Swiss-Prot record:
Keyword field: Ribonucleoprotein, Ribosomal protein
Gene that encodes the chain: rps17e
Any single Pfam family the record assigns to this protein: Ribosomal_S17e
Family membership: Belongs to the eukaryotic ribosomal protein eS17 family.
InterPro entries referenced in this protein's UniProt entry, alphabetically: Ribosomal_eS17, Ribosomal_eS17_CS, Ribosomal_eS17_sf
Record's protein name: Small ribosomal subunit protein eS17
GO cellular component terms, semicolon-separated: cytosol; ribonucleoprotein complex; ribosome
Amino acid sequence: MGKIRQGFIKRVARELFNKYPNEFTRDFEHNKKKVEELTNVTSKKIRNRIAGYITKLVRMKEEGKIL
């Protein structure tokens, strides 16, 4: 079974994804830098989890699984 992300990580990721839809791509490294620019998250672990979830959201949007 996979790991379950915490609710606040999903919430922050969705807020960033909806507020800045053209800033994020399928590239995790690019998204990681953008999350660092757009938020005040100080923890590297939290930043990476948010960037990973945003990467997943971008991929799902491109595949038509979310609107």
